[in-house]
Design a protein with these regions (language model features):
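The feature captures the beta-strand-to-loop junction immediately N-terminal to the Walker
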Residues: 36-38
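A short, flexible loop at the N-terminus of ABC-type nucleotide-binding domains that lies
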Residues: 1-5, 9-22, 70-72, 94
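Helix-to-loop junction immediately C-terminal to a conserved catalytic motif
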Residues: 51
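Conserved ABC ATPase signature
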Residues: 134-138, 142
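Hydrophobic anchor residue at the start of the ABC signature
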Residues: 148
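ABC ATPase NBD coupling module
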Residues: 67-81, 95, 99, 107
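Conserved ABC ATPase "signature" region
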Residues: 114-129
């Protein structure tokens, strides 16, 4: 099993309310699990715990059977990536995009050439002229596709999709979903989709589980 989550719970402050309560699920390679719920239900918190943004209060996460420790380090840091609802948070607003896109190469000692990066980005509909711009100069759809390309540079086996299309227009939504489906078919990446959009969950996912009050329901 690619990802196994057991008894995951989270509170943000001592003696504060539990926002995630004993959540358990598993996702295998090539599968997409949707956690579906209203705003404030705790669904984004689950995804952000898995991606290493927040520590869990209780419970454990296993990747290929190995219990993860947080903050994520070494291979696990590459193998688990996240795509945010607001893609601009992925990029430093003061840096040109070429500099932000070079960062994974530096962190993980990957061979870099500008030409190689440009060729890689073409499948995401991003071209060389985009790279000399700042994040605010791209559309939401362009920036989300670039964020996806940046995540996939790390060659992850698991991707958290935290409302990745909710801020996009219909055409951009379709482009991002198509890219995600193609990537999954090619690489057998496992996805956790966090969404309030039931129609998207039904169209895109292997299984759907509702979340209410931090508690995960049975598949629907």
């Amino acid at each position: 099993m690619l990802i196994e989550v057991q008894g995951l719970s989270k509170r943000y402050r001592p003696r504060g309310p539990m926002v995630v309560v004993e959540v358990s699920f598993s996702i295998d390679r090539g599968e997409t699990l949707a956690i579906f719920g209203d705003s404030g239900s705790g669904k984004s918190t689950i995804g952000q715990i898995l991606a290493g943004i927040y520590p869990a209060t209780a419970g454990e996460v296993r990747l290929d059977g190995q219990r993860l420790s947080y903050p994520l380090r070494g291979p696990a840091r590459r193998r688990i990536q996240i795509l945010f609802q607001h893609p601009e948070v992925t990029f430093n607003p003061k840096l040109r995009l070429i500099d932000s896109m070079r960062e994974p190469y530096r962190l993980f000692h990957l061979p870099y050439t500008r030409q190689g990066l440009c060729e890689y980005l073409e499948r995401y509909g991003i071209y060389e002229e985009h790279l000399d711009r700042f994040p605010a100069e791209l559309s939401g759809g362009e920036l989300q596709r670039l964020a996806l390309a940046r995540a996939m540079l790390m060659d992850p086996s698991f991707l958290v999709l935290d409302e990745p299309t909710s801020m996009l227009d219909v055409i951009s939504q379709a482009q991002v979903i198509q890219l995600l489906q193609e990537i999954q078919q090619e690489r057998e990446v496992g996805y956790l989709l966090i969404s309030h959009d039931r129609a998207l969950c039904e169209r895109f996912c292997t299984a759907i589980r509702p979340l209410e009050g931090g508690r995960l329901g049975e598949p629907v």
